[in-house]
Regions:
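Generic secondary-structure signature for well-ordered alpha-helical cores
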Residues: 8-12, 45, 49-53, 123-132, ...
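Active-site-adjacent substrate-binding region
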Residues: 74-81, 85-167
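Short secondary-structure boundary/capping segments
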Residues: 34-38, 83-86
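Flexible, glycine/charged-enriched surface loops at secondary-structure junctions
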Residues: 13-19, 53-65, 126-140
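Short glycine-aspartate micro-motif
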Residues: 19, 66-70, 160-162
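Alpha-helical metal-binding/catalytic segments enriched in His/Glu/Asp
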Residues: 1-30, 36, 42
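Conserved active-site and cofactor/substrate-binding residues in soluble primary-metabolism enzymes
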Residues: 1-2, 14, 35-43, 61, ...
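A glycine-rich helix N-cap at a beta->alpha junction
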Residues: 37-69
Length: 168
């Protein structure tokens, strides 16, 4: 919901923006409405065709030159279960949106790792806009962790990072 509202309230027209809503993350992002489907890729191809561009490489380059925030929640410091978090790397309430450079579970399984150049772009944009943000991770290896769809977007060489609010 917050991603859609942010898009609708946006006043920039310099770049094409979209909000892709998917489900089925808990079962592997499969199915026609999951992030592993080709819905997003096909939609980009259809938009290019509508604009008169039928070159296959254009779709690849459009996806590759895109930036994405994979909106999801992040684990906040839970005072009842402090042992599952790294106290220096855990998100806290009221410190702003959380950027997760690295997500995944069981070490590197199903992980995504945002590139530092994209993180720098985001930090500069948020600093310039005086918007509070923080970095965090989901928890200690094999104690915390969780799924992400960021890797499904990163497969297009897209710059992507998990971003969202901290919750218990």
């Amino acid at each position: 919901y917050t991603s859609l509202i942010a898009l609708l309230d946006s006043d920039t027209e310099d770049y094409t923006a979209c909000c892709v809503l998917v489900d089925k993350e808990e079962i592997g992002s499969v199915g026609a409405t999951g992030a592993a489907s080709v819905f997003f890729e096909n939609t980009v191809a259809e938009l290019l065709v509508k604009s008169g561009d039928t070159n296959y490489l254009s779709r690849i380059k459009a996806l590759e030159n895109s930036y994405a925030l994979s909106s999801d929640v992040n684990a906040a410091l839970d005072p009842l279960f402090k042992e599952v978090a790294s106290k220096n790397n855990v998100a806290r309430f009221n410190y702003g949106i959380v950027f997760e450079k690295y997500t995944g579970a069981r070490g590197k399984s199903g992980a995504s790792d945002a590139n530092p150049e994209y993180i720098a772009i985001l930090r500069n944009a948020f600093d310039d806009g005086n918007i509070h943000f923080q970095t965090g991770e989901l928890g200690k290896v094999d104690l915390g962790g969780g799924g992400t769809i960021a890797y499904l977007l990163a497969k297009y060489n897209m710059s992507v990072i998990d971003a969202g609010v901290p919750v218990l």
